[in-house]
A protein has these predicted regions:
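Catalytic/RNA-binding core of pseudouridine synthases
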Residues: 1-219
């Protein structure tokens, strides 16, 4: 008989959160395994998995704040709000410095309304918004209340110049936020606040509440 409990997993980018549980199901010989806090396919980092009766406690874990590290790309925006999506808007970013970015970060702290990305798992009449967007349907998502407790610029990664003469800048960021916060949408909104456009790469969840990914004891394969 499998004993109830929790397992900390480090999900690699490219795997779904559901797929990350497969090794545990084989290891423990049970299908009664769930997880708290779905990560985007392209994101990596901490997932807390619950086994057997421990799954009853997942709702209490899901409401915990989350901490992420990511790269903020300024100067363009894509359909997915990920750096390698289809380009939809392009602006300038060569004048944006680490100091000018830091000046606007306090404006993003606290409770606020955020419009989720169209490429998301939010359902409209039972269908994921991302599926509707793929089909070419016009998707309009309502804003949702979120909370950002901490938003820090860790430094500027680089500035690159396109052949068109347009420039874009990349900053390393860290954010601690409430359940339901989309980092992709945050990067979009940061870009708009700076008079340009924004998207994201390398999202990594480093903590759920006080539990850090550095404490993880398993890696999903």
């Amino acid at each position: 008989m499998t004993h109830p409990g929790f397992v900390l997993l480090d999900k690699p980018a490219g795997d779904t959160s559901f797929k990350a549980l497969f090794p545990l199901k084989r290891l423990f010989g049970t299908r009664r395994i769930g997880h708290a806090g779905t990560l985007d396919l392209r994101a990596s980092g901490l997932i807390i998995a619950a086994v057997e009766r421990a799954t009853r406690l997942l709702p209490f874990i899901e409401v915990a704040d989350k901490t992420y590290r990511f790269k903020l790309h300024l100067g363009f925006e894509t359909d997915t709000l990920e750096w390698d999506g289809k380009l939809v808007f392009q602006g300038e970013a060569k004048e944006i410095t680490e100091e000018s970015l830091k000046q606007i970060l306090p404006d993003f702290l606290g409770e606020q309304e955020q419009i989720p990305p169209n490429y998301s798992a939010i359902k409209i009449n039972g269908v994921r918004a991302s599926d509707l967007t793929h089909r070419g349907r016009n998707v309009t998502l309502s804003s949702r209340k979120i909370r950002i407790d901490s938003l820090v610029c860790l430094g500027k990664s680089s500035t690159q110049l396109e052949e068109t003469g347009k420039s874009f800048a990349i900053f390393d960021m860290e954010c601690r936020c409430s359940k339901g916060t989309y980092i992709r949408a945050l990067c979009r909104d940061l870009g708009h606040a700076l008079g340009t456009y924004g998207c994201v790469s390398e999202i990594r969840r480093t903590a759920i509440g006080n539990i850090s990914v550095e404490n993880e004891i398993g890696r999903a394969h």
